[in-house]
Amino acid sequence: MGFRTSVSRGMLIGASVLCFASTPAAAECVIGSEPLFDPFAPYKGGSAIVHKDSGFVFPAETAGFRRLCEMTTDFSGDNFQIRYERTIGDQPIAVDIAVVHLEDLTARDHYRIIKPTVMSHYASASIESEGDYFVSGRDDLSAYQGIFDGQKDNVPWHVSLTAIDYGYWDARLIASYPHELDVPAQEALMELVAAFQWQSPVDEEEGGGD
């Protein structure tokens, strides 16, 4: 699916998305927030977090990954992010999943806005591949993915950025891990994507959002 791009509106949206994208690497995890300041508090049930406006469910553990962070930069509920992590041996695989409300931007537009910020966190970052991405079993979704190589603390690192256009909602996944974990990490990420792939955030109109 696609949207007509409005240059002026796209620039404003791009600025806000870029600002939000810069928080994962710089911000500490928000864990155990006081209820007054926790935007997810009213929607938590059992071990899962349910985002009220989109209906997206984030379990505490899934596909071997453990949920670590509950973060938001927009208390209206339009932008939020959650981090998952899995350890193979003593090496971590970190995945930041963000769901944002964008207008007039395609998955490729979303990806191109975020890419420079993601690459800036790694030394000698280079693009390994980028292009349209197929979400298995979901022909209805438009997605775009880039895979990058870089270094973190002098250790070769692998990073992928995937933007998905759900319509009213857009999602992105930023996965990072040491390059030596490439094969097992890719397998683990496929399991994580499979665990989420059948979820479809509801549109604002469908969900009757505030």
Model-derived features: positions:
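N-terminal signal peptide c-region/cleavage motif recognized by signal peptidases
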Residues: 20-24
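Short, surface-exposed coil-to-beta transition loops
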Residues: 77-81, 92-94, 153-161
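Signature of long, low-cysteine stretches enriched in small and polar/charged residues
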Residues: 123-162
